[in-house]
């Protein structure tokens, strides 16, 4: 279902399909051809968000190295770091933090990446986020 929404929302570029399939060579070709790395699908998700969703660490690294916005939010205000934290993908969380992802970004429910890591019982990810200044959303809202 996600792929259908993705492809329907984007039209011309096939970077979405290449990212979903984990086709590194094709994604590299798209990047070299000047693909818009911050283009959004109908739900506001970028190629980087999909690379995180499908857990393609090498593609996440490629997109980040080529200027993809690590803090771009989709319609529910969730960033790639929220998603990586929810998935408990500690390598991806490290990469995104190193690339400047906002550790305390709030989503539409006032949740932070730490809230997502804690809520999905990813304790190692939660510890990493805390070490990098991560707080729960309730601590950030007056």
Language-model region placement:
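Ankyrin repeat structural motif
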Residues: 23-31, 56-64, 89-97, 122-131
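Post-signal-peptide N-terminal segment of Sec-exported extracytoplasmic proteins
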Residues: 17-66
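Bacterial N-terminal signal peptides
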Residues: 1-7
């Amino acid at each position: 279902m996600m792929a259908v929404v993705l492809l329907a929302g984007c039209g011309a570029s096939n970077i979405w399909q290449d990212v979903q399939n984990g086709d590194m060579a094709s994604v590299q070709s798209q990047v070299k051809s000047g693909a818009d790395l911050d283009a959004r699908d109908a739900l506001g998700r970028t190629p980087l968000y999909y690379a995180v969703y499908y857990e393609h660490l090498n593609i996440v690294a490629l997109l980040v190295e080529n200027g993809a916005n690590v803090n771009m939010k989709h319609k529910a205000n969730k960033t790639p770091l929220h998603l990586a934290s929810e998935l408990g993908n500690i390598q991806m969380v490290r990469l995104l933090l190193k690339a400047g992802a906002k550790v305390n970004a709030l989503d539409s429910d006032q949740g932070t990446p730490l809230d997502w890591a804690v809520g999905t019982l990813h304790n190692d990810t939660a510890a990493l986020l805390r070490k990098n200044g991560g707080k729960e959303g309730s601590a950030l809202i007056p």
